[in-house]
Amino acid sequence: MSHLDYEINKELGECYLFMGEYGKARDYYTKAAECDTSCSDPYLGLAAIAVHEGNYKDALTFYTKANQVSPGEKPLTGMGMIEIEQGNYAKAFEHFAATLSFNPGNMLAVNSLVQLGYVLNRLTDVLPYLEAALGPGDTEAVRYTLAACLMSTGRKDAARRHLEILLGENPANTGAKELYAQLAA
């Protein structure tokens, strides 16, 4: 089969997935995967179908296959979400951490990692990922979260520095004001 067959089947799979016709979408994604085993998109589509159908075991299998074919943030994020759904928090933590090695600004992964850091008592492990997410763009929420995590890990001076930066940039930030007041108390 040709690359054109792959593209047609993949596009039809996407269309049927969007329309909620999962059986047809599955058929076309399966055909696309058979046409070109070096592309991860059909496996991501099959994973999405499995999620919609509540079949998390198959979803994890397809996300894993997609990540084997083409490692990246999409399959790793999907794997992390499924692991959370199944209660495998330590595995989810590792998947989201790996996601952030591809894109430190992936906010779904950042937020999930923070939540898992609290659940697993691994906030110290989360700090480098939050610091890496302080790249260009709107980092107010990330900086606030970093300050809160620093406070929770007993690093009050570092938390204070980040809150001062926040309040310097946005003196009306009520969350930063409240957290700063807690530090002062």
Regions found by a protein language model. Give the residues of each.
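Structural marker of alpha-solenoid helical repeat scaffolds
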Residues: 1, 35, 68-69, 102, ...
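Residue-level recognition of tetratricopeptide repeat
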Residues: 5, 39, 72-73, 106, ...
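TPR alpha-solenoid repeat register
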Residues: 8, 42, 75-76, 109, ...
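Position-specific recognition of the canonical hydrophobic site in helix A of tetratricopeptide repeat
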Residues: 10, 17, 44-47, 51, ...
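Canonical tetratricopeptide repeat
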Residues: 11, 45, 78-79, 112, ...
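Structural signature of tandem alpha-helical TPR/SEL1-like repeats
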Residues: 19-31, 53-65, 86-98, 119-132, ...
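Terminal, low-structured helical/coil segments at or just beyond the last alpha-helical repeat
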Residues: 137, 149-185
